[in-house]
A protein has these predicted regions:
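An N-terminal boundary/leader segment
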Residues: 1-50, 284-286, 461-464
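Short helix-loop capping/hinge segments that flank enzyme active sites or metal/cofactor-binding pockets
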Residues: 69-89, 248-260, 306-360, 373-377, ...
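Acyltransferase
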Residues: 20-25, 54, 269-293, 315-321, ...
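A short helix-breaking turn/cap at a secondary-structure junction
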Residues: 190-273, 277, 455-464
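Acidic/His- and Gly-rich active-site-bordering loop/insert found
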Residues: 49, 59-135
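Short glycine/serine-rich loop segments
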Residues: 101-228, 411-423, 427-432
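Residue-level signal for inorganic ion chemistry
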Residues: 27, 49, 221, 256, ...
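Glycine-rich, small-residue loops and helix-cap segments
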Residues: 16, 27, 71, 111, ...
Length: 464
């Protein structure tokens, strides 16, 4: 049951082959069994989930109209509001915060019949690409407990990868869905701005953060996206669902831009080989592939201005009281953010526009862009995010510029991007491929990912 996908679970619940009570009980036992080793959850809503499962079972027996995910368990990253369930932002600052309303995609999943089993771990305020916090400890990669699950949606990815619920909601402010998806061997989508409404952001107009689905397969992620996407007036970028975002894609004739590097010098050989094999597979199916030389490295500072200045503005005021109760990496990010000037912020806004225009120009030549998700397999679980990373035996540079340089540029530009598994490293760790599409091409991105997943399956038995 734990390895059954969300769509099959929903069908089996509708046809009374299995009970939502049994499904939820199995997931809650799995969470309890793995919490000490993996540590994917901050809060487990066991009582509420069991009560919801009983109501779901009664609805099935009564012949009521059922939603597409009726009785299916899901989890939510602890940066997203959940009505009546504490939302800590991964920090002691908000350890007792209980929202009075759901985030829009949380509400939509509940309305679709899905059952919340808990809130997953995140570094404080999602400030780094590894998942640990003084509030809850360290979240580990289920494929190798000495490695990171990635971040900042690390708990969500680790939970999905190990059967602690087939669906999760994550957030992606600079790769925070795609990094852990690649680290844990699952699928994660960063949507176009506004496709999945994000109404509780402090500054939606300059945000780089997006809410997206995480699942073990593209089909599940796509079905989840169908539920959570759609207009909401609380998000200024939200709009009615586009009519020109088809659910299928014909590979023959596609124009694909392949970006093996984007200003980074080093790429792990296993990563490069696995991703190139996926690209060449598409070429063999009739796609036209061109290697693109694009350098996003000069825009790393632009990304840091948004990240660090935002933290300084929103979290900095709490430092006199909580400064000794938060992670050193968060304090350092806030201190750096406080040093950026208003002119730096204005320049960052202009540079963000430059990134958007450069990426948009690429889509005049290509239908999709493809790249590795990460330049190397998962880092050590205790890696210092302010220290350089190594690839092979060489020092490769900063964690953003050397490990995930392929990701944050599309947070700046807003283009939809999905990470899906495409291979395994020599030491048995997942490797992710990123597919990027034009604005509002989210379903086309998922369609191409689904094509690769069907034709080049690389799933392995569930870890742990």
């Amino acid at each position: 049951m734990l390895q059954t996908d969300a769509l099959t679970l929903a069908r089996q619940i509708r046809t009374k082959e299995i009970s939502p009570v049994a499904v939820v009980d199995a997931v809650l036992r799995r969470i309890e069994d793995l919490q000490r080793a993996v540590n994917a959850f901050i809060t487990v809503t066991a009582d509420e989930a069991r009560e919801a499962a009983r109501r779901a079972e009664a609805a099935v027996k009564a012949g009521e109209r059922l939603g597409p995910f009726h009785g299916v368990p899901f989890s939510v990253k602890d940066l997203l509001f959940t009505k009546g369930v504490r939302t800590t932002m991964g920090s002691r600052i908000f350890a007792d915060q209980v929202p009075v309303e759901d985030a829009v995609p949380v509400r939509r999943l509940r309305e679709a019949g899905a059952i919340l089993v808990g809130k997953t771990t995140t570094p404080e305020f999602g400030h780094k690409p590894l998942t640990d916090s003084p509030l809850f400890g360290v979240t580990r990669n289920p494929w190798d407990l000495s490695r990171t699950a990635g971040g900042s949606s690390g708990g969500a990815a680790a939970a999905v990868a190990t059967g602690q619920g087939p669906l999760a909601l994550g957030t992606d402010g600079g790769g925070s869905i795609r990094i852990p998806a690649a680290c844990c061997g699952i699928v994660g989508l960063k949507p176009t701005p506004g496709r999945v409404p994000h109404i509780h952001q402090a500054d939606p107009f300059s945000s780089t953060s997006y809410i997206g689905p995480m699942a073990r397969s593209v089909a599940e992620a796509s079905a989840c996206f169908d539920v959570i996407a759609g207009f909401d007036p609380g998000d200024p970028y939200s709009r009615p669902e586009p009519v020109d975002d088809p659910r299928g894609v014909e590979v023959r004739g596609l124009r694909l831009g392949w970006l093996p590097r984007v200003g980074n010098r080093l790429v792990d050989a296993c990563v490069l080989g696995s991703c190139e094999a996926a690209v060449r597979h598409l070429e063999g199916r009739g796609a036209r592939v061109e290697t693109v030389e694009e350098d996003f490295a000069p825009f790393e500072q632009t990304f840091l201005v948004f990240l660090q200045a935002g933290l300084a503005a929103r979290v900095g005021p709490y430092m006199p009281t909580f400064g000794d109760k938060v992670a050193r990496s968060l304090r350092e990010s806030i201190e750096r953010g406080a040093r950026w000037s208003a002119a730096d912020w204005a320049n960052a806004l202009a540079q963000r526009t430059t990134v958007y225009r450069r990426v948009r120009a690429l889509f005049e030549r290509f239908d999709f862009l493809l790249s590795p998700t990460l330049a190397r397999p998962p880092l050590a679980v205790d890696h210092d995010p302010y220290e350089p990373i190594t690839i092979g035996s060489e020092s490769a540079g900063s964690i953003r510029g050397a490990w995930y340089p392929y990701l944050w540029p599309f947070n700046l530009s807003g283009h939809p991007a999905v990470s899906l598994p495409c291979g395994w490293s020599s030491d048995g760790l997942p490797i992710g491929l990123q597919i990027v599409g034009p604005w509002y091409g989210d379903r086309r991105v998922l369609a191409l990912a689904g094509h690769l997943e069907r034709e080049r399956p690389c799933a392995r038995p569930m870890p742990l």
